[in-house]
């Protein structure tokens, strides 16, 4: 029985850790050739090593998705290595929290750059490899010859807002509008586009800030996580399943929306939340 993504090429950003790494491993397990991007070379290489050690096929292409010309470089690397692109997953991101009245322009713009501008650039750069290829297939054969889709990562912070995250909320709600627009513009070429909005998932973005995880933003170390005082003693009391989700469970939402089982789903935002927000 063929795997879900046999003979498909998947490009996934932010895949060195957490949800992205879990998704990359599942895609590879299901037969995909995977292009692993991460800001840092070492975690990207670790994901590729894990895939290869399990018998899968992957390459790493590290770098910042916020660099203006990086999108074209990443997607060209995928085509050079594997000849095509079937799935693009816009997963890269981080948080840089602050209350509205204290947030700097730099904080605001940095988060919009990674969560909104970078996905826009990546999808635009994918057009020659996805939209135009599908268009040519339709002209020659009457229909696309291969499945193609885009999955954008959103958040319940975008859908519902979140205290201290006005920049992140704006970016994650903005990507929902981007998703719907892509679905409408590229649907005629058989290309689907969906979003997956995560709730409380156990990653370094939701761990205690006191653990000291950081990300480099223009030479500045930005602390990741949530202050222990804000986390409180019972972080799951508003989640019907009464627990956080794992990176693999979150990745399952990405896999589902990219899979043949979602072939008639486009423009949709799937909430992976353990039931929070219902």
Report the location of each language-model feature.
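Alpha-helical segment proximal to the catalytic Tyr-Lys
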Residues: 128, 184-185, 263
């Amino acid at each position: 029985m063929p795997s879900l993504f046999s003979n498909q090429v998947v490009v996934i950003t932010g895949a060195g850790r957490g949800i992205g790494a879990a998704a990359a491993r599942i895609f590879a397990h299901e037969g995909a050739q995977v292009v692993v991007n991460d800001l840092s070379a070492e975690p990207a290489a670790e994901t590729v090593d894990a895939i290869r050690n399990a018998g899968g096929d992957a390459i790493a292409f590290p770098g910042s998705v916020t660099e203006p010309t990086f999108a074209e470089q990443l997607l060209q690397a995928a085509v050079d290595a594997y000849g095509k692109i079937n799935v693009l997953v816009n997963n890269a991101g981080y948080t840089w929290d602050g209350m509205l009245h204290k947030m700097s322009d730099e904080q605001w713009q940095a988060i919009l750059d990674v969560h909104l501008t970078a996905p826009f650039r990546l999808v635009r750069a994918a057009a020659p490899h996805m939209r135009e290829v599908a268009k040519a297939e339709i002209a020659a054969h009457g229909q696309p010859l291969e499945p193609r889709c885009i999955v954008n990562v959103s958040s319940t912070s975008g859908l519902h807002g979140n205290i201290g995250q006005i920049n992140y909320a704006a970016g994650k709600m903005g990507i929902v509008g981007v998703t719907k627009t892509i679905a409408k513009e590229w649907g005629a070429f058989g290309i689907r586009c969906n979003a997956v909005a995560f709730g409380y998932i156990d990653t370094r973005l939701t761990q205690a800030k006191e653990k000291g995880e950081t990300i480099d933003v223009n030479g500045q170390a930005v602390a990741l996580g949530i202050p222990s005082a804000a986390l409180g003693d019972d972080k799951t009391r508003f989640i019907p399943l009464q627990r956080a989700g794992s990176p693999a469970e979150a990745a399952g939402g990405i896999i589902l929306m990219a899979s043949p089982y979602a072939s008639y789903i486009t423009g949709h935002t799937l909430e992976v939340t353990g039931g929070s927000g219902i």
